[in-house]
A protein has these predicted regions:
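Charged phosphate-binding loop/patch that engages nucleotide di/tri-phosphates or the phosphate backbone
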Residues: 2-12, 16, 162-194
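Acidic-basic catalytic patches of nuclease active cores, encompassing PD-(D/E)XK
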Residues: 8-67
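Short, solvent-exposed loop/turn segments at secondary-structure junctions
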Residues: 53-54, 97-100, 134
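A short catalytic or substrate-binding loop motif that flags glycine-/basic-rich loops and adjacent residues
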Residues: 70-74
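Conserved catalytic cores of phosphodiester-cleaving nucleases, focusing on short active-site segments
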Residues: 77-98
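Short, electropositive alpha-helical surface patch
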Residues: 139-162
Length: 194
């Protein structure tokens, strides 16, 4: 198309970038946790991934660049912290599938860690976002683990989440108010409420 004044508009074809897949849920949770901290409601933090730095290009302190690093030990879960005197520990996962959540998305050591937290009186759960469906679920670790221990397939169908998990609706601030579900659980309610 020719615009007045000879202005040419570039046709920008957006490339699909897979390196940050799963980051939208993480960003929403990070913003939510910042909000909780600002209003002094809870103190929940993203755990750093444990790495061993092997090689550094060190021209100056301000310009140091890590050239080579390795994961030292398997990371446990994404987030942990305190809320109303309770220890909270959880994992956040995204999937583009419309029908199921692949068990390959979560590692055995993470499941064991969540189970240990639950057995020791903490609150452990997994937040799973089905990005294509724009649905985010809060599933208690014990329900997730029970399914995994009895699984005959390598994925969890979405109908399991619809029956056993709590739906987390998107809100402006905080983006994902998962502590509403934690309040419901702490309150001693065993039933599912959406």
């Amino acid at each position: 198309m020719n615009y007045p004044g000879g202005i040419k508009i570039k046709n920008i074809n957006k490339e699909i970038n897979y390196k940050n897949r799963g980051m939208t849920l993480e960003n929403d949770i990070n913003k939510t946790n910042e909000y909780y901290k600002e209003i002094e409601k809870a103190y929940i933090y993203k755990k750093p991934t444990p790495i061993k730095i092997v090689k550094v290009d060190y021209p100056s302190r301000e310009k140091a660049i890590i050239k080579e690093a390795y994961f030292t030990i398997p990371s446990t879960t994404d987030y942990n912290g305190l809320y109303k005197g309770k220890y909270i520990d959880f994992e956040a996962k995204e999937t583009i599938s419309k029908t199921s959540f692949s068990l390959s998305n979560i590692h055995k050591h993470q499941i064991k860690h969540l189970d240990n937290i639950d057995k020791n009186g903490g609150i452990s759960f997994i937040i799973v976002r089905f990005t294509t469906l724009n649905k985010t679920y809060f599933i208690l670790a014990k329900d997730f683990i029970e399914y995994v221990n009895n699984a005959t397939r390598k994925s969890i169908p979405i109908d399991f989440f619809e029956k056993k998990a709590y739906i987390l609706n998107d809100t402006y601030r905080p983006p994902i108010d998962y502590l509403k579900v934690v309040d419901y659980i702490i309150g001693g309610n065993n039933g599912k409420e959406n």
